[in-house]
């Protein structure tokens, strides 16, 4: 990112921001609520247009007006603080939806990948459960697994522990720490210092 500016009305949230993230890095954006962390993540994923500056991804300026955001979004996974799981779908259905519908992958291959990830995140026994049958920490780990099934190059995590009870924060942070071993690039917005 080079000299990125983003405002909402007269409130300048990002002011000439420069940020360089290398492949395989885990970067934490730490600051109080309202400091622009979530806005920055939404700009990286092209969910928010920037007012000025440049956002480069894979050697391409993706911030130029008219750039199609969909190819970028297929390469960047995002996990929101509110989980955003579909309540009428099982854990497995939630996880497999995007890879099958958006990426055109085979359902059986996606289910096998999803089961392996659920196992890795300690949730294999929850594949047939619905979101309202899970704790907040379990729902957040399902959201992380869902983002990982598209095999993103970059994973954006937006305040993923902020809505959790203190006793559940540890299990979600452990899941993030385990991503370190995969070589994935992770950008984590948080006010959590642990």
Residues of each region from the PLM?
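ABC family nucleotide-binding domain
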Residues: 3-194
């Amino acid at each position: 990112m080079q000299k990125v500016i983003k405002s909402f009305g007269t409130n300048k949230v990002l002011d000439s921001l420069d940020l360089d993230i290398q492949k395989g890095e885990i970067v934490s954006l730490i600051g109080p609520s309202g400091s622009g962390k979530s806005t920055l993540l939404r700009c990286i994923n092209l969910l928010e247009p920037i007012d000025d500056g440049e956002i480069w991804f894979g050697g391409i300026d993706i911030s130029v007006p008219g750039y199609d955001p969909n190819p970028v979004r297929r390469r960047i996974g995002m996990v929101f603080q509110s989980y955003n799981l579909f309540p009428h779908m099982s854990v497995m259905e939630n996880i497999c939806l995007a890879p099958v519908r958006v990426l055109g992958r085979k359902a059986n291959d996606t289910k096998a990948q999803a089961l392996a990830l659920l196992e890795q995140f300690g949730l294999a026994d929850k594949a047939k459960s619905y979101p309202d049958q899970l704790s907040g920490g379990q729902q957040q780990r399902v959201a992380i697994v869902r983002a990982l099934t598209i095999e993103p190059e970059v994973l954006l995590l937006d305040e993923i522990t902020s809505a959790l009870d203190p006793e559940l924060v540890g299990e979600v942070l452990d899941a993030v720490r385990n991503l370190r071993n995969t070589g994935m690039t992770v950008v984590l917005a948080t006010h959590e210092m642990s």
